[in-house]
Structures are given as structure tokens and as C-alpha cells.
């Protein structure tokens, strides 16, 4: 099963996976009863966020409006009534807090399925634990640009607060948050890469080495990307985590 909201990407996936039996779904409720293996790779970073800014008189929502005929950030005039949570404690004026409203129902659905039927969910994304600050970003052609430039033409995302995912899966066992590079090394990626490199030459070998570095090196995806697993309680932790 694949959950994809973009019609354009669905067409691309269908072309790439035409030799396989795949069913596209609109939501997790369409997955039939039974144990699941659910992989969320760079899924949660794409979900919408709400941002809140701490000002002298309290918290205000960060909004987008028009200034000098261009998109610009601003804040709501009305102060918000904020419940005391970990997100909003130990903050000072000017701090920004990000909340993903859709995380709770999605993770609750995933954890309920795993708790009842068994299985595992592996979440791979860039982020951290107890995340605070402004992480809203835009990428176009592998370059970071102003998120308010070229609306509709760029990849918008924000870092994932893995602690929020864990809090909404309290009925399951949660693995330690592990760097992607550490996990891949524990699973033997370097040994496997060396074996594969023996049959490669020229540009193929160069690309192979670059791909290994990109996935594992601390200055690339190795540390930026984190991995967390959700399992039934009393389960044995999977290899590498």
C-alpha cells in the first residue's frame, strides 16, 4: 500500500512500480486488519505546521500576509491562550514554537493498529527530540531559498519533533532516536557497499561512493536524519536501534 496525496507523484509511482502489485490509499483506515510494516520516510516533515512567536505580552500566531506587494511574515494581533506544555516552557521573547496538528491523529491511528494487530512502523526524517525554534524551509533545485519566494514551485517542509510522535504513541514501545548513519553502519552498509563496489567502474563507482557518503556521513544525511521505531509493547527491539 502507498499513501500519496499528489496526483503527479501517483502517476510517477505507478510508472516505476508497474511490475508490482501496489494499491494506493487515501488514508490509513483503508489498510485491512492485520500486522503491518509501515515505513514513513520523509513523510512527517511535509505535514503542515503552525508557528507561534513569544512577544512581550504573550504568545501570538505567526502568519503570512502581504507587505509591499510581496508575501511577508507577521503575527496575529490577538494574544493566544496557550496551555502550559513542554513546547512553551523555558522560552524567552522572540522564540518560535512549531506545532503539527495532524501528527496526533496520524500517529494515534498507526500506534492503535500496531498495538492491536502487531507489526512495526519505522519513521525516518530530519529533526530532533523536543524540537524548538523556526525550522520552516524551502528547497528548489537542491538549494535553500526564502520560503515565501516562488509559492507553489518549491518543496516546503519543517523539521520533525520526534518527541511529539512518541507522546502520541504511548500505547506502544518506542525505540531510542538513532542517527540514520549510525543505524546503517550497525546494519552493515559499509561492508555491503565495499562488496558492490568491486563490480563498478568510472562514474558508476564514483556515484556509488558518493551515495554511501551522503547516507552515512555526519556532515550529510548521517546525523541530520533520525530513525525511530514504533512496536507493540514487550517486543524485542529491532536490530540496529
Give, region by region, the residue ranges found by the protein language model.
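Long, Lys/Arg- and hydrophobic-enriched amphipathic alpha-helices
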Residues: 83-241
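Conserved adenosyl
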Residues: 1-53, 58
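A mobile, often basic/glycine-rich helix-loop segment
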Residues: 37-88, 136-147
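Short secondary-structure boundary segments
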Residues: 1-9, 13, 67-79, 239-241
